[in-house]
């Protein structure tokens, strides 16, 4: 019997008198086939260390521990720590850390792996309400995570993996794809969770690029420009950029010059620009002194 078997999950929750907290976005997976598919998608083996976020009662952790060298699981809800100690007692390669991963000193934590030189993968069923902040925090950290295999709201997975000229494409697509290649692995129905969420889920596989997708002179400015360009989706690039940078004649002249130098029409919308277009645009705007 597995932790994820519905009867086992139910028994564990009852034994420990656990009640779900909405504020933590807790939905526990009760489908062993999906858990095995997650591990297979992530290609977990004994030459890989894993960081898991939000292990819950250990359903995914159990599968990871059987396949990985070590698992470091960050759980923000202190009520789940004794439950995890109970459900994972047979796995001595799991370290449960009662900490908010957004506040954790990850640089120090990853040195606590017995074999810290092994590749580190992030495999997680992320709380939906905080998926994007956690993902960007991990991607932008200086830790060379080789891969992320993450369950998230399908709508967010669509946005991350979206191509230009689609409704889902936006600054989040650019922010992630700048660092990672993305692949939608498979969909997960809401019926396989306890309690069932109000949305459908998907597993997204993200692999770190050896080099960022495009070369830019100032990364922070590049991301600032891409965010500004999607400020109001229905507005033109020109309108969004003037809303962000200002509407003085001096600013407008600089914008005009930058757009001309980047060979980008002011009348198009942000969603029509590729990531390389945004790289050209941000460099031109920076050069213009904006």
From Swiss-Prot:
SUPFAM superfamilies: S-adenosyl-L-methionine-dependent methyltransferases. It is found in: Cytoplasm. Transmembrane segments: none annotated. It holds the Pfam family RrnaAD. The keyword Transferase applies. One of its GO terms (molecular function) is 16S rRNA (adenine(1518)-N(6)/adenine(1519)-N(6))-dimethyltransferase activity. It comes from the Bacteria. It catalyses: adenosine(1518)/adenosine(1519) in 16S rRNA + 4 S-adenosyl-L-methionine = N(6)-dimethyladenosine(1518)/N(6)-dimethyladenosine(1519) in 16S rRNA + 4 S-adenosyl-L-homocysteine + 4 H(+). GO terms for cellular component: cytosol. InterPro entries: KsgA/Erm, rRNA_Ade_diMease-like_C, rRNA_Ade_Mease_Trfase_CS, rRNA_Ade_methylase_Trfase_N, rRNA_adenine_dimethylase, SAM-dependent_MTases_sf. S-adenosyl-L-methionine binds at residues 27, 29, 54, 75, 100, 125. Belongs to the class I-like SAM-binding methyltransferase superfamily. rRNA adenine N(6)-methyltransferase family. RsmA subfamily. PANTHER family: DIMETHYLADENOSINE TRANSFERASE, DIMETHYLADENOSINE TRANSFERASE-RELATED. HAMAP family: 16SrRNA_methyltr_A. Specifically dimethylates two adjacent adenosines (A1518 and A1519) in the loop of a conserved hairpin near the 3'-end of 16S rRNA in the 30S particle. May play a critical role in biogenesis of 30S subunits. This is Ribosomal RNA small subunit methyltransferase A.
